[in-house]
Structures are given as structure tokens and as C-alpha cells.
């Protein structure tokens, strides 16, 4: 991950929570990479030691403790950020205890590693069985011999010696010299520093002595210019923008613009109006503008009026306009909603006004719009009147009665596209329009494509209306059960409400819905209602299915399987078939499979215990970020699944079928982490010894 100042990066929402800014409206993804995808380094350093030669100079050296190796990667420009490309690995070993967890460069130029050296590397398990006496430190040096380094003490070095170290081939000396100059406040070196050719090191030394008089924003070296703009943000100095075109410098200008007061900093947003294939510049520009949108509102609008050409830039039209309108609308309140109207008043350009309108509309997804200022209501109505056929979704959210009639007609129109019918059903459900239930039920009862029914089903689930479970269950064999995905979606929806679940188990008890149609996650969802009739049905039809944790029987079977695979592994191609059938709906391996659970490629796959422990007792150690959540809504639904997204306005829960359900924060009655893994136990059930050998051959493939 490349973190610019003031940026936001992708993270595991379930593990780390939402972004700290609810108006960030985006984040940086991980840097692109070419090479080994088993990425799990615990540490890295960019080597500038001068000892190991050109093959390593400037390279990223990153230990991978989980896979007992050390990567070497080239760092390459990628728009305003970077990408990496793997080269020959520095170290590989078959010793599975080799666990390098720290990396650095020493004063001799050698590459140093701290090796944890242990049988496992996990912070999830609280079991204290670490091997505490075997850690070690390694140094990597040229094969020709150890580097010759005379004893030294930088704390006693003279000023002239420290100045000399600023151009040392080893970055360690360059940085330590700057620290010494700063710690000893060697202001007598300022004239000599100013007389030296300007480098990053001399600039840093001058800055450490508070002796930079003019920021070198026009220097020929773009990295000196970039650092100068960083200093501008930190020192609250506003230099002129000039004609800067170097994309990395532009990124820093935008990062500094976020820190600087808007009176002059808004003009710096133009630094983002250049092509950037990484997509970072538009986000940096947005974060800079958003920081001032409310706190310095008057200055923002004065700038827009004083520089109307900025509103016509690609940056503003494609990346800022919609976000800014959404930000004001989402914040709410009279002043912010008036700012939405003020945005519309800035221009007569219908395309740009459409961007503003789209931003306002997106702020109210999932709910009707509040009472808006008259000026904004008029602007919205004028916009909708000019649209061909009207903007139906926007009209619905604004409370337009005629729009409701049109929406219901579209929902029931068999000639309309499935996409349009599902989209309008979703909007009607979010708005709680009870009139939509009957046409939804009609779709579920009739012969329609499973894809349409699945989309309608997710919308219908929001309504607490008994017509929905009746339609599903009375037409189970003829309209639902034939398609596996639709069938399981229907069962999850039925299991989500207590009253519906009671009706469902009555059909199971009467053998009208087959027991075999239920997956373990659906049975577990039923159990969350804590209802005597439902619990009795679970005990009758799925006794023992929900038992978790280690048992003597599980341990015995795991040992048996381990003995089987010790005799030799089987056919990788056949093992892949087993994986795709049993695991791929949730897990990715070798770039194939689902994304509900973690990507397995980077784990300790050569270790049979890793696989067997997780297969037989998956709830014993649930990987952070992949734990399930149980959400009870104020509308009576119980949802279970992974946290797919989270912000200040609500969450998105992803179930085992990859269906995503958005729940607004105000609609959540209770949310808690589940102690039970989504992963079912008994994945190896029904496998012959030959199947097991094939299966593990694929799982443990190098």
C-alpha cells in the first residue's frame, strides 16, 4: 500500500471498522504487483546500503515469514503511485521454522533480519506454546567476505565529518548524520549546507535546523520539489502553483492542499487535473476539497464563482461535482441543503447540474428525501421535468405520488428488462412502499427467470408481510426448488424472520420442503431465533449439525487423514475438481474461487495441520477480518454474514451466496460478532482415500 499524506486505504472493514471520514467516498487500493501472489510479508525495507551491488540497490527486500523466504522486488512508477515486480528471491529454505519478522540495513551496508524461528506464526491462538529460546538475527553480505567497517561514534563526529556523511553511499549514515546535526542543533553548519549542492539530505538538514528560507518548488529535481511541497503543507506556506506537471509532485501538492487554508489552497486543486492511471490524484483532490467544504464553505463558493473555468475542468466534472453535492446532502441540515441549491445555481450547464443532482440523490439511497429548501425542491423538479420520461428513482425518493404509480407499473411489466425491474423493486423496498409487495409476490409465484426472482427476493425480504413466505413455500417445488441458488436464497430469506422461520419449519416437519435443501449456515440462522418450535425442528432434522469445537471423533479422523496423505499425494487436476466443488464458493486459491473467505494462496499450505485444524474446527481460530456478524434490524430481520463495507451511515452484510444487503445505521437494533465461523465443518466427508490424496495434492501444490 502506498500512503500519501491524508489519504485513506482499503482495509478489512469487519476487522478495522469504517474509514475515519464518512465523506471520504473512496480509498486507495493496494499497489499493483507482478510475480509471486503469496504475499504475506511482515516487514520490508528499501535497500540503499551500497554493499550488495546494483542487483539490490533501490530494491524492496521483504521477508515472508509464513512461506520461509525473502522477496526482492523492483519498485516501478505507476501513475502517481508505484507498482512492484518480483525478481529472484534473496533467500528460500525448506526449514519451516524460518520466520523472519523484521528487516533493516546496518551501518556496514548489510541486510539484517530478525528471525522469530518457531513452528507457527499466529497471533490468533492464545495458546502459549512458543519456542522462546531459538530466535536469531541474520546478516546478508556479499559472498566475497564481511564488510570492513572501522569503529565509529557519530555522536562525537565533527561538523565536517557529518557533512561528508550526507553523501555517503549508505542511507543509514546519511540519515544518522541528519539526526546528529538536529540533536546537537549545529546551526554553525547552515552557511556550509547552503553552499553545498541541494540534495534531499541537505534540504532535510537545513529543515532540521529551521534554516530553509525559500522552498525549492522550482528545482530541477522533482523529488526535491515534492519534498518542498510537503514542507509547504506542514509549515502552512502557500507557494505559487506554477506549471508543475510531474505526477508525483502533483500528488504531494494535493496532499498539502488539504492542510492549507482554503483562501489560496483551492487553486492548488488544479494539480489534479492531469491524467493519472492509478486514480489517486482525483481522490487526493477530493479529500483536499472535502476538508474545506463545510468548515470554509463561504471561501469555497467564492472560489467557484471567481474561477468558473475550474468548474469546466475534467477533474471537477468527472470527480468532484457529484461527490461535493453528495457530501452536503449527506451531512444534512438547512445550511448544507442550501449549499446543494447553491451548487445548482452555479451553472446552467445541464450535464454539470445532472452531476450535482446525482450526488444529491445518492445521499438518500434507502430512504425518502427529507423536506428540502424551496430552492432545492424547485431545482430538482425542474431537472426531473427535463429528463426523458423523468428520473423515476429520484422522483420516488422525493415523494412524488405519480412516480409511485409509474414504478409499480414498471415492476409488474413483463416486457421491461430484468435489471430495470430489480432496480425499481430495490428502491421501492428501501422506501418501504407496501404497495410493491403484491407485484413482487406475483413475480415469485409465476414462471420467471431465476435471476429475476433472486433479485426480487432480496427486495421483498425487507417487507414483514406473510404473503411473501406463503408465495415461496406454496410454490416451492414448482417455482423455487429447481434452481439451487434461488432455493438457498429463499431459505435464507425465510430463516431471517422469526414468523417466517416458524412457517418454514412447519413445512419441513410436513415433508413439503426437503431437509437436504438446507445448508449449515441456514440451519444456524434458524437457531438464532431462540424459539422452542424452531429448536425442536433443528433437533429433529439436523441433530448434531451445529456442534462445534474439537471432539475425540474429529481428532481421530484428522489423524487418519494425515496418515493417508503421508503415504503420498495424488493427482493435482483431480484435486482441483474437489476444491472447486467444496471450497471455491468461498475461497480463492491460485486466482480461482470466491471472496467470502480469505485467499488461501498465501497461507502455510505445505503444513497438513494448517488444513486439518481449519477443516475440523474452523471456529477455533477465526481469521481476523473474516469473522461473521449477526445483525438484527428494527424491522425484524436477522442477517448473518461477513462485513463487506461499513461507514458512518450503515453497513453491508455479505452472505454465503455473496448476496449483499445494505442496512442503514438507524435501522440496526443489534449487531454482534459471531463466535462461529461461516466455514462448515466436515469438508472431507464422503471422500475416499484416493480423493483425499488428490484434494491435498492441489491444496499443497507449490
Question: Which role does the model predict for each range below?
Answer:
Residues 135-136, 205, 439, 577-591, ...:
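C-type cytochrome heme c attachment motif
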Residues 48, 141, 364, 582, ...:
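Sec/Tat-exported extracytoplasmic proteins
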Residues 1-161, 180, 591, 665-666, ...:
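Beta-propeller domains with acidic blade repeats across secreted/periplasmic ectodomains
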Residues 114, 128, 132-133, 140-578, ...:
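Long, ordered, helix-rich scaffold segments
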Residues 202, 529-530, 540-552, 560, ...:
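C-terminal capping alpha-helices of c-type cytochrome domains
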Residues 112-114, 546-547, 552, 569-584, ...:
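Sequence context surrounding c-type heme c attachment/ligation sites in exported
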Residues 121, 221-227, 234-235, 585, ...:
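Inter-heme linker and motif-flanking segments adjacent to c-type heme-binding CXXCH motifs
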Residues 57, 122-126, 472, 597-599, ...:
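Short beta-alpha junctions and helix-cap segments that line functional grooves
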Amino acid at each position: 500500500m502506498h500512503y500519501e499524506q491524508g489519504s485513506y486505504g482499503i482495509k478489512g472493514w469487519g476487522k478495522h471498522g469504517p474509514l475515519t471520514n464518512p465523506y471520504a467516498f473512496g480509498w486507495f487500493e493496494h499497489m499493483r504487483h507482478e510475480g509471486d501472489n503469496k504475499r504475506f510479508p511482515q516487514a520490508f525495507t528499501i535497500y540503499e546500503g551500497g554493499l550488495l551491488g546494483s542487483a539490490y540497490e533501490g530494491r524492496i527486500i521483504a521477508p515472508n515469514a509464513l512461506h520461509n523466504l525473502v522477496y526482492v522486488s523492483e519498485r516501478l512508477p505507476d501513475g502517481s503511485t508505484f507498482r512492484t515486480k518480483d525478481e529472484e528471491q534473496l533467500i528460500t529454505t525448506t526449514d519451516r521454522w524460518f520466520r523472519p519478522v523484521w528487516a533493516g540495513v546496518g551501518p556496514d551496508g548489510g541486510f539484517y533480519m530478525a528471525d522469530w524461528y518457531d513452528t507457527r506464526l499466529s497471533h490468533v491462538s492464545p495458546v502459549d506454546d512458543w519456542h522462546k529460546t531459538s530466535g536469531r538475527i541474520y546478516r546478508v553480505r556479499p559472498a566475497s567476505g564481511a564488510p570492513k567497517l572501522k569503529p565509529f561514534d557519530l555522536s562525537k563526529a565533527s561538523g565536517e565529518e557529518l557533512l561528508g556523511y550526507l553523501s555517503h553511499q549508505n542511507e543509514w549514515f546519511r540519515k544518522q548524520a541528519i539526526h546528529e546535526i538536529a540533536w546537537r542543533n549545529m546551526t554553525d553548519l547552515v552557511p556550509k549546507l547552503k553552499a553545498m549542492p541541494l540534495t534531499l539530505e541537505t534540504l532535510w538538514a537545513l529543515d532540521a535546523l529551521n534554516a530553509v528560507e525559500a522552498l525549492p518548488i522550482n528545482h530541477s529535481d522533482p523529488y526535491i520539489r515534492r519534498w518542498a511541497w510537503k514542507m509547504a503543507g506542514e509549515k502552512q506556506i502557500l507557494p505559487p502553483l506554477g506549471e508543475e506537471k510531474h505526477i508525483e509532485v502533483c500528488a504531494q501538492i494535493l496532499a498539502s492542499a488539504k492542510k492549507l487554508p482554503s483562501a489560496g489552497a483551492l487553486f492548488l486543486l488544479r494539480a489534479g487535473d492531469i491524467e493519472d492511471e492509478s486514480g489517486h490524484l482525483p481522490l487526493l483532490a477530493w479529500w483536499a476539497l472535502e476538508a474545506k467544504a463545510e468548515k470554509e464553505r463561504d471561501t469555497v463558493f467564492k472560489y467557484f464563482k471567481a474561477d468558473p473555468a475550474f468548474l469546466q475542468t475534467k477533474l471537477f466534472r468527472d470527480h468532484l461535482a457529484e461527490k461535493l453535492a453528495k457530501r452536503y446532502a449527506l451531512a444534512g441540515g438547512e445550511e448544507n441543503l442550501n449549499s446543494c441549491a447553491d451548487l445548482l445555481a452555479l451553472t446552467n450547464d445541464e450535464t454539470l447540474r445532472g452531476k450535482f443532482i446525482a450526488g444529491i440523490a445518492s445521499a438518500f439511497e434507502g430512504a425518502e428525501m427529507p423536506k428540502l429548501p424551496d430552492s432545492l425542491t424547485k431545482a430538482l423538479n425542474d431537472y426531473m421535468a427535463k429528463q426523458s420520461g423523468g428520473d423515476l428513482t429520484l422522483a420516488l425518493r422525493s415523494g412524488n405520488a405519480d412516480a409511485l404509480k409509474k414504478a409499480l407499473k414498471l415492476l409488474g411489466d413483463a416486457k421491461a428488462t430484468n435489471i430495470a425491474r430489480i432496480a425499481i423493486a430495490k428502491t421501492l423496498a428501501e422506501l418501504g412502499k407496501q404497495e410493491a409487495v403484491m407485484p413482487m409476490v406475483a413475480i415469485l409465484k409465476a414462471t420467471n427467470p431465476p435471476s429475476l426472482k433472486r433479485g426480487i427476493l432480496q427486495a421483498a425480504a425487507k417487507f414483514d408481510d406473510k404473503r411473501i413466505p406463503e408465495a415461496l413455500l406454496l410454490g416451492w417445488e414448482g417455482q423455487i426448488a429447481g434452481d439451487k441458488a434461488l432455493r438457498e436464497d429463499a431459505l435464507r430469506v425465510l430463516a431471517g424472520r422469526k414468523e417466517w422461520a416458524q412457517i418454514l419449519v412447519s413445512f419441513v416437519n410436513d415433508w413439503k420442503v426437503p431437509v437436504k435443501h438446507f445448508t449449515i449456515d441456514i440451519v444456524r440462522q434458524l437457531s438464532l431465533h431462540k424459539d422452542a418450535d424452531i429448536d425442536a425442528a433443528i433437533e429433529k432434522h439436523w441433530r448434531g449439525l451445529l456442534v462445534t469445537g474439537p471432539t475425540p471423533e474429529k481428532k481421530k479422523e484428522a489423524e487418519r487423514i494425515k496418515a493417508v496423505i503421508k503415504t503420498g499425494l495424488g493427482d493435482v487436476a483431480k484435486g482441483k475438481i474437489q476444491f472447486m466443488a467444496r471450497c471455491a464458493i468461498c475461497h480463492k486459491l491460485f486466482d480461482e474461487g470466491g471472496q467470502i473467505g480469505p485467499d488461501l494462496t498465501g497461507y502455510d499450505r505445505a503444513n497438513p495441520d494448517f488444513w486439518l485444524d481449519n477443516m475440523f474446527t474452523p471456529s477455533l481460530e477465526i481469521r481476523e477480518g473474516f469473522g461473521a456478524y449477526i445483525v438484527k434490524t428494527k424491522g425484524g430481520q436477522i442477517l448473518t454474514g461477513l462485513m463487506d463495507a461499513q461507514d458512518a451511515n450503515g453497513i453491508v452484510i455479505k452472505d454465503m451466496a455473496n448476496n449483499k444487503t445494505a442496512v442503514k445505521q438507524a435501522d440496526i437494533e443489534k449487531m454482534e460478532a459471531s463466535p462461529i465461523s461461516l466455514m462448515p465443518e466436515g469438508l472431507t466427508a464422503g471422500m475416499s482415500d484416493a480423493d483425499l490424496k488428490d484434494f491435498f495434492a492441489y491444496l499443497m501444490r507449490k
